[in-house]
Amino acid sequence: MCFSRADAADNYPFGTCQQRKLFPHFHPPNLIGNKFVPLRGSPHRGPGCYFSDGYGLAYDLSKIPTSIKGYTLGARTAVRFKPIQKEMTPHAGRYQKVSPQQEKHKQNFAPFNVLVPRFKNYPKDTYYPSPGAYNPEKKPPPKIAWPMKFGSPDWAQVPCLQKRTLKAELSTDKDFRKHRNRVAYLSLYYN
């Protein structure tokens, strides 16, 4: 009879100052209650009753009642892809003694180009030619130089076509320019 009264007193009217179920101690039956698990006391605490794998935080998180059908009418939905639980910490017998004498690793790179030879080995024939094998007064190849007058070509001495009133270039003009440049180039070698 006493328990039925407590169940009926759970529905508090809005605006009253009575005690309500607040989050740290109670949780809503929806997705927020799944994600943020409230504080709960463990009833199995005492001598000989402590099993960390059965009554811990990880156990409570894995045993939340959820539904894989989807989120409808406040139902708690399960995680679609559960995280893989990995035990990365080795047990006490797996630890090994570190001995720095045995751990000598070969470097896979040389810092500051240490392995580069200090002096380059050049073949002596090409870099140090014998006397008489070259001409020190060798001239660079000749370039075409038009008759110049104050930094620009002197067109009075260069053969040109007569000026026309029509500015269009004919194919004969192009042939004449090609021939003039060819004659100037060949005159460097055949004078």
Curated annotation (Swiss-Prot):
InterPro entries: CIMAP3, SHIPPO-rpt
Keyword terms, alphabetized: Cilium biogenesis/degradation, Cytoplasm, Cytoplasmic vesicle, Golgi apparatus
Predominant subcellular localization, coarse grouping: cytoplasm
GO cellular component: ciliary basal body; cytoplasmic vesicle; nucleus; trans-Golgi network
GO biological process, one term: embryonic heart tube left/right pattern formation
Pfam families: SHIPPO-rpt (PF07004)
Transmembrane region(s): none
Entry superkingdom: Eukaryota
Subcellular localization, as worded in the UniProt entry: Cytoplasmic vesicle; Golgi apparatus, trans-Golgi network; Cytoplasm
Keyword Oxidoreductase carried by entry: no
Gene Ontology MF terms in the entry: beta-tubulin binding; cytoskeletal protein binding; gamma-tubulin binding; kinesin binding; protein kinase binding; small GTPase binding
Presence of the UniProt keyword NADP in the record: no
Subunit architecture: Interacts with proteins involved in ciliary transport, including ARL13B, CETN1, KIF3A, RAB6A, RAB8A, TUBB1 and TUBG1. Interacts with AURKA.
Protein role: During primary cilia disassembly, involved in cilia disassembly. Required specifically to control cilia retraction as well as the liberation and duplication of the basal body/centrosome. May act by stimulating AURKA activity at the basal body in a cell cycle-dependent manner.
Protein name as annotated: Ciliary microtubule-associated protein 3
Species per Swiss-Prot/TrEMBL record: Homo sapiens
Gene from which this protein is expressed: CIMAP3
